[in-house]
Structure formats: C-alpha cells, structure tokens
Amino acid sequence: MADIKTGIFAKNVQKRLNRAQEKVLQKLGKADETKDEQFEEYVQNFKRQEAEGTRLQRELRGYLAAIKGMQEASMKLTESLHEVYEPDWYGREDVKMVGEKCDVLWEDFHQKLVDGSLLTLDTYLGQFPDIKNRIAKRSRKLVDYDSARHHLEALQSSKRKDESRISKAEEEFQKAQKVFEEFNVDLQEELPSLWSRRVGFYVNTFKNVSSLEAKFHKEIAVLCHKLYEVMTKLGDQHADKAFTIQGAPSDSGPLRIAKTPSPPEEPSPLPSPTASPNHTLAPASPAPARPRSPSQTRKGPPVPPLPKVTPTKELQQENIISFFEDNFVPEISVTTPSQNEVPEVKKEETLLDLDFDPFKPEVTPAGSAGVTHSPMSQTLPWDLWTTSTDLVQPASGGSFNGFTQPQDTSLFTMQTDQSMICNLAESEQAPPTEPKAEEPLAAVTPAVGLDLGMDTRAEEPVEEAVIIPGADADAAVGTLVSAAEGAPGEEAEAEKATVPAGEGVSLEEAKIGTETTEGAESAQPEAEELEATVPQEKVIPSVVIEPASNHEEEGENEITIGAEPKETTEDAAPPGPTSETPELATEQKPIQDPQPTPSAPAMGAADQLASAREASQELPPGFLYKVETLHDFEAANSDELTLQRGDVVLVVPSDSEADQDAGWLVGVKESDWLQYRDLATYKGLFPENFTRRLD
C-alpha cells in the first residue's frame, strides 16, 4: 500500500517538473506553445461575467440588509407611537393595527426578495467555481500535451532512433491529447452558452425585484393613508390644542431661511499712529460678485460691498472726532496748493479718510460759523465767501473746469477791496491805528504771487496803500488825482514798459487806460458818490476768476487785479507830500485796470455767460449728473461699461425704463467724453449701487 502511494506521489512530482520545464522553455522561446485565441476570448468573458455577478450579489445582500433595517425601524416607530397614544384618543386600536401590518409587509417583502432573487443569484454564481477549475485544468493539460508533443518530436528527429522509446512517446502523446480535447470541447461549448444566458438572468432578477417592491409599496401606502386619516380625525377632535412651531416648514414647500450674504468690508489700516488697534477691519475679498448682465433679464444690479457709514453735513467736527475717542487727528490742508506742488497719491486709505473726506471741516475762528466744502469741488459759491482774513482761503474758481489749479490772485483782490471798504467807513469816525489786522493778509499774498509765477513787487504798492491809514478819504482822493495829473509822462512810460514785458496787455488796452485816467480826473468832484458805488462795483468782478495756467493769462489777471486796488487806493490813501504821491501812483500803474470802472460788472456777467456756455458744450447731450465709482465693475456684455474705483461717469437718460427701474444707469466715462466727444460709441450701462452721486 505504501509503495502505491509512493508511486503516485512520484508520478505527480514528475508531472509538475515536466510542466515547469515546458513553461520555462516556452517563455524562453525554445519551445512552441499551442494557443487558441477564441478560447482565450471566452475565458475573458467568463472572468468579466463572474465579476459582474459577484458585485450584483454583494449589492443585493446590502439591499436586503437595508430592508431588514427599515423593518426594524418602522416597527420601533409604531411601537413608540402606540406607547404615547392615550387610551381616550381616537383610533388607538387602528394605530396598533397599522403598525402590525406594516411589520408583516416588511417581513414578507424581505423574504420574497431572498427567495426570488438572492437564492437565484447564488445558484447562478455557484456554477462559476466549477467552470473556473475546469479552465485551470485545461491549461495544465495543454502544457502536458505540448510537452508530450515536443518529446515525441525530439525522439523522431534524433540520429539514433530507438523504436521502443518512440512508440512509448507516441502513446503518451495520444493520451495527453485525448485528455486535453475532452476538457477543451466541453469548455468550448459551455463558456459561450454561459455568457449568453447572463442577459436572461439579469432580466428575471430585476423583474422580480421591481414587481415585489411595487407590490410592497402599494400595500404599505394603504396602511400609511389609514394612519393619516386617523391622525386627521384626532386633530379635528383636539383642534383647540393645536401646536404650531414658528419657522417650521409648511406644506407649500421646504423651509428656506433667506440670508443675504454680507459682502466683506474693505481693508483699511489704522487711521493714525495713536489709534487703537480695535478700529482695524478684517481683510476682505477683492471684489463683489459678478452681476447679471443687463442685456439679459435684468432683475436688478449686483449688490456691492456694504456701504460705509458717512456722517451728515449737520455733524460738527468735535462730534465726528469723538466717535473714535479723540484719537483721530484729521489731516486737513490749511494752505492753498501751489502750482509747483503735486499732491501725493494715497496708496492706502483709512476708514476715517473714506468716511470723513467729503465733509472735512474748515478752520474757523471763534464765534464764526463753520463752513465745510466737498473735496470734489474745493470751492464755495461766491455768495457764501466770508471776508474774514483769519479763514483759510478757498480754492480758486479755476477748479470749476474739472482740474486742480493754483490759487488765483482775485482772492487777494476781493479781500483787499472788502477790507478797504471797512477802512473807509472807519476813517470817518475813528483816528488811524496800527494796521495789525492786515498782517495775516500780507503774509498770504507772497505765497499767492509765488504760486502764479508773478512778480510780487507789483502788488506791494497796492498793499502799502491798503494798510496806510488816512484821516480823510476825500483828501486822499484829491492827492492821488493831482499826482496823476502831475505825472502824465511817467504814466505813459510805465504803460509802454508793461507791454513789452510779455504780460498780455496790448496797445489798445493802454489807450483805454489813458481814458480811464481822464475819467478819474472828472470823477474827483464826486468823491462821495464814488464811495457809495465802490462796494457794489468791487464784489462782482472779484467773482470772475480766470485760471492762471500760462504767462498770457497771468498778464490778464494782473489787469483784473489792478481794477480794484486802483479805486481802493484813491479812497484810502493818506495825505502826504506831493513828491511822494506821484511816485506811488507811478508804481501802481502796471497793475491798474485800463478799463473804466462802470464796465466791470458787465465784463463779469459776460465772462460768467461765456464760462457757462463753454461748460455746457463740454457735457454730453441730455447730461443729468455725475457719479463716482465706489467699486470695480467688469462689463459682461458689449453694452456695459468697465469701471474702476474712482472713475467719474456722466449720466445721461436711459433708453429703456426697465433698466432704469431695475437699478441700471446709462452714462459715459468723463475721460472718454473729454477725449473722444462721442456719446453713442462710448456710453454704456452700469449698476447704480456701485456709484455715488456727485452734487
């Protein structure tokens, strides 16, 4: 018995060695290998079919486990409802019956799925292991077949032939071929059949699952409707004990808590070195959300970042500063910007700068009302200007043309005239005093002259005439007129010297100046009437301010300045020696206005009319107002404007009322209008809530 087992074991070992040797030779290419490509395709399909069936079995088992879990959960839910149900409530037994029937339905559904689908699937997959083993055995028999064939071929091709060995090798070859063909034929028939039967199996399985599930849901729906009717009747019996939850979802749809996302605040550094750190804002995201294009269904413009809280104009300066515990020192420029000074561009803005820039307070003396002005215009209307020399001088009217320009000398003329009017009134009632009140004005005047690039020495005689007190205004007028009559030659020489100096005074204007001097001689007997007309004639020309941008305009400004100091000097000059008076008159000649005094109001009105006409020509047709962009806006369509923060847009009437009602405006950027003057090409839509209006 032991010998038999030993022989079988040795035989198996010998087979394995032969197979290993044959595979090595085949891998090395020293022995050919029998291949069946069609059978290999069958094997690949079999492996795929087995993987699909295994996955289907796994998912079906998970589905059945979920059904079992639902059965237990439903049973526990009905049990809890039955426990809380009071005995006197309607439908107590019905609730218990519904729970029991639901449990029976779940159990029946689970069992039918197990019997009709899972067991069938297990049977379907049960045939794969046997076929898989037969495929592996066939591959081994194929190696034995190749080995026997190679051994027979080697004996037949050898020079020394042994018939006994050849005949034995032929028998082994025929035996290996027979065994291989048995496995091969069976698998060649079975594998394609198994691959084709998978379709019918899938159909039967899922038809069974779907029918069972439909039947289950139909039956359990009846029970759920029964429970719903019981609960409805119970609610009707206890209608006075209704319980409502605020914010609970209604039958109309799910509960939607609408919460508008608050856009991030704009980052800003500390307002000042002494400001506390708790005033800083958290870093923000770069830009607001992309707005919907107005060319599509415009339901409204995009929502910009949260607007900043800006104080109203009625707030006083001390109230604004007290909001930040007196740690904020407002940066207010109290000097007029000169022509050579270029304002620094702020790289960063603080929250306080953004909030309070439009309402920067102006330095005012005690007892006087605070006057504020917007930095967009930097000027006040002429009828609101104050004559106090302690106030900071407002910006010149040249800023009305849209560009920042230096202070014009007409401000000096205005305050000098008004101060001289006051001095004329005081000279008749009080003795002369020290001219200390005019010292601040004298300090401002050289700065103005430096800004305009003019010779301040031409204005010094006027200032001296202003601050020298006189006892009698009539005597001063007579002295100046007599001096003017005594020095006609010097006056002519002064006028000739003014013309070649390049100050913009023509010979025709010089002739007009001579007529003015003659008119002044005839006006000497009417000194009192002149005093009465001076206040009316001085204020209006001082409002007409021309921008000083080149030398020619500076010359014209000199003439405008001289129109008022001439009358002022005649009214306020003190009596003195005759030899000094002509010299003073001669020094004043280059800055005198060659035009007669009565024509000054007419000239001012004409200049105002020309300025208004020029301003109207610079605006597009149908101009409404200006706005400033607060946030960047990128155009989504061709009919929209791409705006950057700080851009100024000229708003014109909208072609579509729907866009305007939805919050969209139509306009053209001021820079494009000034450069191209083409409204049709460069106008476009932009959201109104991305901008603020400039008054």
Swiss-Prot record:
Region ranges (Disordered): 244-312, 486-617
Location in or out of the cell: Cytoplasmic vesicle, Secretory vesicle, Synaptic vesicle membrane; Cytoplasm, Cytoskeleton
Phosphothreonine found at: T260, T280
One GO term (biological process): synaptic vesicle endocytosis
UniProt KW Cell cycle keyword: no
Coiled coil ranges: 10-83, 144-191
Membrane topology: Peripheral membrane protein
Tissue expr: Neurons, certain endocrine cell types and spermatocytes.
Subunit structure: Heterodimer with BIN1. Binds SH3GLB1. Interacts with REPS1 and SGIP1. Binds AP2A2. Interacts with AP2B1. Interacts with DNM1 and SYNJ1.
Stated name of the protein: Amphiphysin
Phylogenetic classification of the source organism: Eukaryota, Metazoa, Chordata, Craniata, Vertebrata
